[in-house]
Amino acid sequence: MENMPVYMIVNLKINDSDEYRIYEKGFFPFLKKHNGSFITFDDSPECLEGNKPNQFDRVIIFSFPSEQDADNWWNDPDYQELSAHRRAATDITLQKIKGMTPRT
């Protein structure tokens, strides 16, 4: 299972656009530094089943080639300093999903 990709799924609600913009501008250099890849985002995700959590209005998905890369990104002290802007500006859930080999 080593070197399996890791996917990050973010659900968030932006409460302070100016503060979040500071975070957003600094996010991509850290993603690149830790070998991450932006996949997509959606400001109006469609809930096909169940109840859409009303507190969130944006979904973001990005990935890393390994769990170690994801952990290095998360634990980077400079990234954590930047993420203070995100924490101040949003309500958020962030999930780390480990890639798995398809079952046969």
What are these model-derived regions, one by one?
Residues T93-I97:
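Short, electropositive alpha-helical surface patch
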Residues M1-N75, K98-T104:
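Short S/T/G/P-rich N-terminal loop/turn motif that feeds into the first structured element of a domain
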Residues D71-W73, D78-D91:
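C-terminal structural segments of small proteins and small subunits
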